Amino acid sequence: MASTRAAIRYAKAILDLANSKGVAEAVNNDMKSIASAIETNTELSTFIQNPTTTVEVKESALLEVFADVNGVTKGLFHLLFENKRFEILDAIAVEYNKLFDESNGVEVAKVTTAIPMDAALEAKVLAKVATLSDKKITIENVVDPSIIGGFILRIGDNQYNASVANRLQVLKRELSN
């Protein structure tokens, strides 16, 4: 919990700095690539979390891996190394993306399906979901085979569960009463 609060604070500060320098979108792209790299590369994640690796080694390695990032992002790296908080970099990247989207009026619609959505289906869902909100919508597809079929749509605090697993659960409750 504390690292999440710290990540939010760092993300807000970086967003403010990036906005003042006019590079918020470039930093957002950096944060997306950082979050994606840490999430998909277990070696990188383990390297960042490893307490036996010195701060200097981590800093030089990560500046080499993310050599093409914006100066504000490099400044964040340096600040995290100084404060010995580099283990929360992935959380900061995720929080920055959320704050950036929020400040630009973008809302994320999380669609959970049993199998990955193809581009055509994603376009149909996006068109339908766009009518439900006055904000710009982006789709995030989460694959969860346990829902068996159908989908679960979550936009902000609203959720619509049209999954087969949910229907079976409702049927089970009705039959047991």
Swiss-Prot record:
Membrane topology: Peripheral membrane protein
Positions of disulphide bridges: none
Pfam family, one: OSCP
Record keywords, A-Z: ATP synthesis, Cell inner membrane, Cell membrane, CF(1), Hydrogen ion transport, Ion transport, Membrane, Transport
Molecular functions per Gene Ontology: proton-transporting ATP synthase activity, rotational mechanism
Gene Ontology cellular component list: plasma membrane; proton-transporting ATP synthase complex
Main location: membrane
UniProt family annotation: Belongs to the ATPase delta chain family.
Function as written in the Swiss-Prot or TrEMBL entry: F(1)F(0) ATP synthase produces ATP from ADP in the presence of a proton or sodium gradient. F-type ATPases consist of two structural domains, F(1) containing the extramembraneous catalytic core and F(0) containing the membrane proton channel, linked together by a central stalk and a peripheral stalk. During catalysis, ATP synthesis in the catalytic domain of F(1) is coupled via a rotary mechanism of the central stalk subunits to proton translocation. This protein is part of the stalk that links CF(0) to CF(1). It either transmits conformational changes from CF(0) to CF(1) or is implicated in proton conduction.
Assembly mode: F-type ATPases have 2 components, F(1) - the catalytic core - and F(0) - the membrane proton channel. F(1) has five subunits: alpha(3), beta(3), gamma(1), delta(1), epsilon(1). F(0) has three main subunits: a(1), b(2) and c(10-14). The alpha and beta chains form an alternating ring which encloses part of the gamma chain. F(1) is attached to F(0) by a central stalk formed by the gamma and epsilon chains, while a peripheral stalk is formed by the delta and b chains.
Protein name: ATP synthase subunit delta
UniProt organism field: Flavobacterium johnsoniae (strain ATCC 17061 / DSM 2064 / JCM 8514 / BCRC 14874 / CCUG 350202 / NBRC 14942 / NCIMB 11054 / UW101)
Gene: atpH
